[in-house]
Amino acid sequence: MQLVFSYIEHKSQVIPVCFWKENHQLHPLTGYLNDPMGGLNYFAFLDKVLSMLRDEDIQQGDISSNSWGVEIHGDQVYFCFLFAQEDTSLHFALSRAVLIDILVLWLAFRSQKPVAGYQEVLSFAEA
């Protein structure tokens, strides 16, 4: 699977986005990373999430955003869309270690000077 981090121009601003290279449809992971309802402090929130994921003492935890229900259960992280929890196509599970790696790279990408059209592609095995 390939996850694309990109900067796009939107309403005269250059903003970071991520999407699956193979499928641009709504997906729990990319929806969570992009969550537009997260507000201006969303990336600070994701940094806090990263700290929780790295804390091995936390075996159960709620790291939900405004749109996505996300729970830590041991070495796995489970996602669902809060506005359609019964829609299993919007459920997703990922290993905690892989989510840590993705968040580290997403936050680093997000902290760069934005350049419209710039992309980075991450490749990893399906979880």
Curated annotation (Swiss-Prot):
<dbReference type="InterPro" id="IPR035416">
    <property type="entry name" value="DUF5376"/>
</dbReference>
<dbReference type="Pfam" id="PF17346">
    <property type="entry name" value="DUF5376"/>
</dbReference>
<protein>
    <recommendedName>
        <fullName>Uncharacterized protein PM0491</fullName>
    </recommendedName>
</protein>
